[in-house]
Structure formats: structure tokens, C-alpha cells
Amino acid sequence: KIMKSNNKYFNEGDYVSGWGGVQDYTITNGESFQKINDNKVSKESYLGVLGMPGFTAYFGILREGQIKDGDTVVVSAAAGAVGSVVGQIAKIKGCKVIGIAGGEEKCKYVTEDLKFDYCLDYKNDNFFSELKDKCKDGVDVYFDNVGGNLLNHMLIFISKGARIVICGAISQYNSHKVIGPSNYLSLLVNRASMKGMVVFDYAKDYGMAQKEMRDWILEGKLKSNEDIYEG
């Protein structure tokens, strides 16, 4: 919310979205902010599905993942801000979607609310055997938010021409021993690709992505769930 403005394009009391940092107040010339004039979608959505997490999902799965109708897509951290949107976009585009999340409650949310085809609980003792079973026909796109041992296993299941999108590696961030992939020759055998993506590379297209995802929300095709905390 704008508290004070000397900018002719923004008025005091306007709500905006943009890159302001994790802080109480920011001073800006307005170039990186967009005014929110929307009485159909919540303002909070512009921090989530219509903000940076949503843009990451949109460009990651569509531009980098290059999904097409009939693809099998696996998404790690499927209940998270990015993964939840990735899987829903893949479903909109006609893909079979397998999510990976931690715990029964998250997996239930992924399948019942977000309508993924399957969700595997990585906390289960038989997780890797379940993963092998669900991926036995090959994986066309793996959207990776986790890295580590899971990424290494997913390399075994990729199809010819598969695309692996590296968005994050949350299993490795606080690890004393970084686990790198040893099954990387699968990329060679399957003529597959593994590429990192950074959402800022697509800044010029944010408006287009925001409009399309907003339409999906209004059509009931895309759901979001924001957790709001005070303080």
C-alpha cells in the first residue's frame, strides 16, 4: 500500500505489486511496481500465484519445460507456492501430473484440491518403490525444487528428449554434505536436458503471464492458498 506519493502514476492509498524487499517500507521511483486494480481476485494473490512464485511456475514449466498435451510431469515440493502452480498449469495443458510432497495432509491437498493425478509422500518408507511404479512409463518433464537424492533418482526415470527444470534445491541448502547427481549419463542416453531457470529473466513478460493466470483463476482452473501471519 502506498503511504505517500509524488509520482503522477501512483496515489496515496493505492495497492501495488512489485519488488520491494522484505521490509516494512521501501522508497521507489515506481518503475518496478504495478498498480492493482482488481475487485475479482484477492490482493494477496498478487504476492503468490500472480506474483513471483506464480511467474516462476509459469515460465519454468511452459518456457523451460516446454510441456505439451500428454506429457508426464513430475513436480517436487508440490504443495509449495511454486510447485502447486506448476502442477496446475501442467494439468491445464493436458499433462499427467505426479506431485511429491511431505506428509499425508499435503498429499491430500495436492490431489483433492489441486487435482494432480497422484501425490507421493517422500516420508513413506516405500517412497522410492512407489516413485518407480508411477514413473515406469517414463517422465517427460521433471520440475525440481528439491535437488539431492531425489534429483538423482529422477534421472533414472526420464524419457527420451526429457526436460529437467532446476528451480531450487531445498534439500541441500543447509546440508553439510552436498549430494550431487551421479546418474547424469541418463541425460546423454536419453538426449535429455537439465537447465536452471531464474524468473527475473522473463521480467518483460510478467504482464502477459499475470493476465493469463488471472483468467485461469476466474475460470476456476487455477487455485491458490495464501497463509497470512501477523508480525
What annotation goes with each model-predicted range?
Residues 11, 42-43, 66-72, 136-137:
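Short helix-loop-beta connector
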Residues 1-22:
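Glycine-rich beta-strand-centered segment in the early N-terminal region that forms part
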Residues 126-136:
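Short amphipathic alpha-helix with an adjacent loop that forms part of the alpha/beta core around
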